[in-house]
Design a protein with these regions (language model features):
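Conserved donor-binding loop and adjoining core beta-sheet/short helix segment
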Residues: 1-5, 15, 21-24, 28-81, ...
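Short amphipathic alpha-helix that is part of the acyltransferase structural core
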Residues: 1-25, 108, 112-151
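A conserved beta-strand-loop-helix scaffold within acyl/acetyltransferase catalytic domains
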Residues: 32, 58-59, 141-196
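Cytosolic beta-strand hydrophobic patch enriched in CBS
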Residues: 42-47, 167-171, 226
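Acyl-donor-binding surface of acyltransferase catalytic domains
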Residues: 56-120, 251-254
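Conserved acetyl-CoA-binding loop-helix of GNAT-fold acetyltransferases
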Residues: 71-79, 194-197, 203-217, 240
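Conserved GNAT acetyl-CoA-binding A-motif
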Residues: 84-92, 211, 218-230
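Conserved active-site alpha-helix within GNAT-family acetyltransferase domains
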Residues: 93-103, 208, 231-248, 255
Length: 258
């Protein structure tokens, strides 16, 4: 049965979420935002033997689910619908059992290792310029208004100050040419997202440079590094950058009628 989690569940949740990209999101949110905030919620699902079998994390209505054998898929499906989640991300097997309508199938990659060096890599770029780059590359995910930028910035800085997020960028002559950041970090895992490169500078290795700078730094810290690929062309980019397929994710948004 799914029940609202409390701070006393944190260590059990972190252990349950180890070595898993969805678990990285859940652990990162739990550590960063806790259990008592209005926009961040966590639920734990337990078996009849009181064993933890599923965790649901919702941040601003965007949910991530990690479920294992013995979870109640019908209860998860009902919860997704009842709480009108804006979006839901989970593993492919759970998605096929819990999403009643269509969803996107995404490829998951894990970093095996690949060397690539570029001197112009920075860890403290001008964030407004980074946001502008992300906006130009991912207009469906980023908004041009000031409030959206400030909300994104405050969330990233909040997590970065707690060592739950980081960024790498190529900056030449004061201009951000490419950037990549982690959307989630836990004690043993990290998920890299938003690898962006200025359209005029593509095919020069700048996107690969920030991706590998970030991935190698995380790997050196003993973390498993994951990316979740949006499409086939991006998947090829990851394959050429030292990442190997390790599974599939399922993603849906509210308009798909979960």
């Amino acid at each position: 049965m799914l029940k609202i989690a409390s701070a006393g569940d944190l260590e059990e949740i972190k252990n349950f979420c180890r070595n898993n990209p969805f678990g990285a999101y859940i652990s990162c949110r739990a550590v960063a935002y806790g259990f008592e905030t209005g926009f961040s919620k966590l639920w734990c699902g337990r078996s009849k033997n009181d064993e933890l079998v599923s965790v649901v994390s919702s941040l601003g209505g965007n949910a991530v689910i990690l479920a294992k054998d013995g979870c109640d898929n019908e209860e998860l499906s009902f919860m997704i619908s009842a709480f009108s989640m804006n979006s839901v991300l989970t593993d492919y097997d759970t998605g096929t059992k819990c999403f009643s309508k269509r969803f996107q199938k995404k490829e998951i990659f894990r970093f095996d290792g690949c060397d690539f060096k570029l001197n112009e890599i920075e860890s403290e770029p001008e964030m407004k310029d980074v946001y502008s780059l992300f906006l130009s590359c991912f207009p469906e995910s980023y908004q041009a208004d000031k409030d959206s930028y400030l909300s994104w910035l405050s969330d990233f800085v909040f997590r970065k100050n707690r060592k739950l997020a980081r960024i790498k960028a190529v900056v030449l002559d004061g201009k951000v040419l490419s950037a990549a950041l982690t959307s989630a970090e836990s004690e043993d895992c990290a998920v890299i997202s938003s690898v962006a490169c200025n359209e005029k500078c593509r095919n020069n290795g700048y996107g690969k440079a920030v991706l590998l700078s970030l991935a190698n730094e995380l790997k050196a810290e003993g973390k498993n590094v994951f990316v979740i690929s949006e499409n086939r062309s991006v998947s090829e980019f990851y394959k050429k950058s030292g990442f190997k397929n390790c599974g599939f994710a399922a993603y849906t948004e509210r308009h798909n009628n979960v």
